[in-house]
């Protein structure tokens, strides 16, 4: 007896079609949760060596995949393009939907092998890579927002360091969102803030140079808002968020490197 389970996964639910020796014997819809998956599990247990096929739908099919792996069921996961090409021959009309029954019938035709399940560490690496990419995109967006708001409050500050980015720059932006915060402090206080703005070693000569340059830029600047403007808090917020994102992204990168070493 050959039993094929075709599963059409969507956002919150999945359509299940069960074919035995080529004939559909059952079909139903389950929620993508423990209750729904347990109903599917009950049917899987009634047959020997069930063939399970579904289309990869990103994060939506991830839970079904994890459930099947937890109970040691082999499955065939099709990428969307592969599914479309292989199922076109089973459609009466080109506009017909790829559904669970068609997925199951296609397995009878193509006899696909089960999808190779990699070690968990590889899934972790893919998740970390996606997380890293998302944080990189967040960093770019936040940098652009900081740049725009600084054009109103203290655009000259972007010229203090060689590049307007990184730990020291963002710390200085938080300390000096507009020129008044520079000109209201003594030179010794400014030197101390610059000294504390970086976790790296910085020479006294460099500190003195940056202090003099900062004062010059502040005197040159014309701020379009008052010291009480909420835009100054916005400047600080973006700078603080950039620090947080940068630090967190480095943690993720270190984790990726460590896990990659363990794969070898």
Which stretches of residues belong to each language-model region?
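A detector of single, family-specific signature residues
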Residues: 1-264
């Amino acid at each position: 007896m050959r039993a094929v389970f075709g599963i059409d996964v969507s956002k919150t639910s999945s359509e299940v079609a069960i074919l035995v020796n080529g004939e559909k014997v059952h079909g139903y819809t389950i929620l993508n949760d423990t209750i729904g998956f347990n109903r599917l599990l009950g049917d899987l247990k009634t047959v020997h060596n069930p063939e399970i096929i579904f289309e990869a739908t990103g994060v939506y099919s991830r839970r079904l995949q994890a459930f099947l792996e937890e109970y040691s069921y082999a499955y065939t996961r099709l990428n969307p393009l592969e599914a479309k090409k292989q199922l076109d021959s089973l459609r009466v009309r080109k506009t017909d939907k790829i559904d669970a029954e068609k997925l199951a019938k296609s397995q009878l035709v193509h006899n696909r092998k089960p999808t190779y399940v990699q070690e968990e560490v590889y899934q972790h690496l893919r998740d970390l890579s996606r997380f890293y990419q998302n944080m990189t995109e967040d960093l770019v967006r936040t940098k652009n927002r900081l740049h725009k708001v600084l054009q109103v409050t203290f655009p000259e500050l972007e010229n203090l360091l060689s590049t307007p980015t990184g730990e020291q720059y963002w710390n200085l932006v938080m300390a000096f969102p507009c020129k008044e915060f520079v000109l209201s402090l003594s030179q010794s206080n400014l030197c101390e803030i610059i000294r504390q703005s970086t976790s790296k070693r910085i020479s006294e000569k460099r500190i003195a140079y940056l202090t003099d340059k900062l004062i010059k830029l502040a005197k040159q600047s014309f701020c379009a808002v008052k010291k009480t403007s909420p835009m100054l808090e916005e400047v600080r917020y973006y700078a603080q968020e950039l620090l947080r994102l940068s630090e967190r992204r480095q943690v993720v990168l270190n984790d990726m490197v460590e896990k990659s070493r363990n794969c070898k």
